[in-house]
Amino acid sequence: MTIVFRLEPGCLGPDGKQYIEEFCLLVQRAFAQKTVGIVQWEIIPRYDKLLPETEYRLGERGFSRDKAQRYLNACGKDLDTLESQLNLALPRMIEQYLARD
């Protein structure tokens, strides 16, 4: 299963559009190491605000959050926990990224 998470460029400040692609790759790499197995993260910029912040996919097929939760529960994982880990880590990662210069 793939969890697609879109990050707003503004989370990196007024010049965020310049850095968001690189930052998304860093976040994706970090979470790929933490969630080995049935879950893959796709962290991408959210340039289009009409697209949802989070999507759930199995192959090319998208499905609802409820179905994603049931799928993960059947595999012994919890969607709330996975999303919480990302949401807790993001502010720290943003802070570290902005302090890199």
Task: Give the positions of each predicted feature.
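Short, intrinsically disordered low-complexity segments
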Residues: T35-Q69
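Surface-exposed beta-strand edges and their flanking turn/coil or helix-capping segments
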Residues: Q18-I20, Y56, Y71
